[in-house]
Design a protein with these regions (language model features):
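Core catalytic alpha/beta fold that binds nucleotide/phospho-ligands
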Residues: 1-274
């Protein structure tokens, strides 16, 4: 899985690169900035719903900002899916599956995931099986009391303790985003206890481990986690992909994914009802 590709709504070359990457490797990550993907029609509404004073106004502003990021991330996701399927974004209908994972209605040849934080929007696409992505500002500090015990295995806590003090926060953030990505891919999210599985330290091949550190998954899972700079701001981006073993789908264009023979048979049956 390659590094995430920066994209804009009116870009061309980067979208060609994204589509070629998806076709060549079966998975692709793309990211954008909120200012580039903010839905124009929602600007005034977002601002008006955020107006207020004191604590209530601050809460409304926070909620409005979250809604704006969510709307922008869905706009980016729709564009990414449209490019992948060689269709118009107006033809894409996003929905959610039984576990709450985002999906493309009527299109099971591609799996999708998204994450948004601050001004960053991150989207993952795969034709191999399942995908989950997560992103956080690289300087975020996970400070909640006892957090490491709630989200890390004993083995992971030992690995973190072995790091120089200045690197522990970054190490914990890496684990957090990997766990978010993995549980998003399997459709569980934070419902799945984060201390029930783990990952090895940075520098080792990334694999899911049991709490005792023994491998829990094999080569069907692939991961990526790195720090990327977006307009001078560092973000930790992580992704998890599960290859379900059905082979890589190379033709996912909307116009060609239906078998011509099947279409002809269905059409003949429909004509017979007239």
């Amino acid at each position: 899985m390659g590094a995430s590709i920066a994209v804009t709504a009116d870009g061309r070359d980067e979208w060609i690169e994204a589509r070629e990457t998806l076709h060549a490797h079966g998975s692709v990550l793309v990211h954008g900035r909120l200012p580039d993907w903010r839905p124009q029609a929602a600007d005034n509404e977002t601002l008006s719903t955020a107006v207020g004073g004191g604590r209530t106004g601050r809460r409304q502003l926070a909620h409005a900002a979250a809604r704006e990021r969510r709307a922008a991330s869905h706009l980016l996701l729709g564009h990414a899916v449209a490019v992948a399927l060689c269709t118009d974004v107006a033809e894409i209908e996003l929905t959610r599956g039984p576990t709450g994972r985002p999906a493309v209605r009527g299109c099971d040849q591609i799996d999708i995931s998204l994450s948004h934080t601050a001004d960053l929007l991150l989207v993952g696409l795969t034709t191999r099986g399942l995908i989950g992505v997560d992103a956080e500002p690289a300087d975020r500090r996970l400070r909640a009391a006892g957090l490491e015990r709630r989200v890390c295995t004993v083995r992971e806590r030992g690995d973190l303790d072995a790091l120089p003090p200045r690197e522990r926060a970054s190490g914990l953030l890496r684990l957090w985003t990997l766990k978010e990505s993995y549980t998003k891919a399997i459709g569980q999210g934070q419902r799945f206890p984060f201390d029930a599985f783990g990952f090895g330290p940075e520098g080792e091949p990334v694999r899911v481990h049991r709490p005792d550190g023994t491998p829990a998954t094999g080569s069907e899972w692939s991961f990526r986690s790195d720090i990327r700079y977006v307009h001078g701001v560092a973000f930790r981006m992580s992704a998890a992909v599960r290859d379900v073993g059905l082979g890589r789908t190379t033709d996912i264009d909307v116009a060609t994914t239906l078998d011509a023979g099947i279409v002809s048979t269905v059409q003949e049956a429909l004509d017979g009802w007239e």
